[in-house]
From Swiss-Prot:
Name of protein: 2-phospho-L-lactate guanylyltransferase
UniProt enzyme class: transferase
Physiological role: Guanylyltransferase that catalyzes the activation of (2S)-2-phospholactate (2-PL) as (2S)-lactyl-2-diphospho-5'-guanosine, via the condensation of 2-PL with GTP. It is involved in the biosynthesis of coenzyme F420, a hydride carrier cofactor.
Species of the source: Methanothrix thermoacetophila (strain DSM 6194 / JCM 14653 / NBRC 101360 / PT) (Methanosaeta thermophila)
Pfam families cross-referenced by the UniProt entry: CofC (PF01983)
Record-level GO BP terms: F420-0 metabolic process
GO MF, one annotated term: phospholactate guanylyltransferase activity
Pathway(s) served: Cofactor biosynthesis; coenzyme F420 biosynthesis
Amino acid sequence: MLRPVHCVVPFKSSGCKTRLSSALSGEQRWQLAVAMLRDVLRTLRSIGMVTVLARPGMREDIIADLDATLRFSELELGDALNGFIDENTAAGWPADILIVMADLPLIREEDVLEMIRTPGGVVLAPGRGGGTNMILIRDSRFRTRYKGLSFAKHKREAEELGIEAGYCYSYRAGCDIDEPGDLIEILLHTNGESRALLERFGLRILESDGRGRLDQTQSNE
């Protein structure tokens, strides 16, 4: 029988996705960040409890229809997440903690279930470039190290604590949206709010030399 899972999604509500600035305006990047968050929450709502960790000032109505709790924290990402783990530990560990990044609009329920079914005191799903896109924590000793090449740091954290680590290698879970070229993946592989938004912005895929490239002829939205 699968243990209860509490999903935690950290969300940066200001100055988000600056590496997309060559393709999207500041307002468009904000709208996309919200759309991706909502796509992630829609995937997670069938898994268990869901909490969004955000800085104070984020509007609660953005996620009000998605059965998620909004929790504010002034702390940096790693400290906010580790504080959440501390509280879960103090409460007797009522549920395992699944940390999911908010820029994974490609993930589906089966990707999350694969994480939950993978054995280990901690289960890591790497992102491209050395990041960690999802972490399932079953052992209350584990704490996150979300800076720089976090995947290697999380592996080392588990090793140093003597925690058995499991790994979940998924294309969709590994596809975080950071660069303009990543937007193609949304248009190709999703049918959620993120794709609808990019199409409304006028973005589309053109074929060039047998490969897809992003047409940045955009609307003024």
